[in-house]
Amino acid sequence: MLPPHRRIGVRFANGGKALKRIDLNVDIGEGFPFDRELLKFATSANIGLGEHAGSRELTTETVAYCREAGLRVGAHPGYPHRASMGRDPIPEGEHKVYFDSIFVQCQWFAAMYAPDYLKPHGGFYNDTAVVLPEGWRTENDAPTPYGQEGIFLSKHPGVQFLMMLLRVYKLPLMGLDRTSHAEVARRAGKGFIKEGFADRLYRDNGTLMPRDRPGAVIKDPDRVAEQVRRLAPKVDSICLHGDGPDCLQFAERVRKTLEDAGYEVGA
């Protein structure tokens, strides 16, 4: 069970006024040097599973100190492509190899560590956070092969694969609202944690700007703080990246921005 200060909920102050609680999640266990220091600011940890970066030994070590610190722990599987750190799309004809790797990653991690949720990494995140076609149905029944949903899923096999993972491992999904992430989480029935990114530029359709585009990663701390204030009313969790030289400065700024705005930071 999570310690009392980490549990999901709200507290009341100022004569019974509820303060919204917002989680700060961080991607760690990927071999970068700031993981332990980031835990001072984060309340959830997305732990790499050793294929896009890091190793199983590093994953095991990371889980141990995150649990000790009282953080909520998420499985963070990624494509087994170390050269891009799992950020590139799946190469043509390699879907089965990549999906098999992710399934094995999740199988091992779920059996060993009982994660609290799942958050895809990098290319797996982007490939499964797809804007739904107009008129998408919201019933719980399975999509028909030749209906709108069936055609959509055939074009985006990662979305269907992600839904299968959530059902098999019975986990909530942390992901991008107003995309297929929200829909697969709803269909899997275990919950959805709406996520915003403090340091990433968004496209007009609400998805993330690809990292190779100019300005896709926000490096100005004032702009990061401004984005956090804009996102906070709309999301349940804000992501802090731990792979940049200024990540600790940004993490401290994000947490202070939320607390100064009256939010309670916690999972």
Would you name each region that the model predicts?
Residues R178-Q227, L231:
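Active-site rim beta-loop-alpha module in soluble metabolic enzymes
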Residues R82-Y117:
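Glycine/small-residue-rich loop that forms an oxyanion/phosphate-binding "nest" at active or ligand-binding sites
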Residues L71-P91, K119-F124:
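Short, charge-patterned binding micro-sites
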Residues I47-H52, G147-K155, K170-R178:
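Catalytic beta/alpha-barrel core
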Residues D35, G54-Y65, K155-P157, R178-A185, ...:
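Active-site-adjacent beta->alpha loops and helix N-cap segments on the catalytic face
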Residues R36-A42, E61-G74:
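Acidic (Asp/Glu)-rich catalytic clusters
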Residues C247-V265:
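C-terminal helical cap(s) of enzyme catalytic domains, especially alpha/beta-barrels
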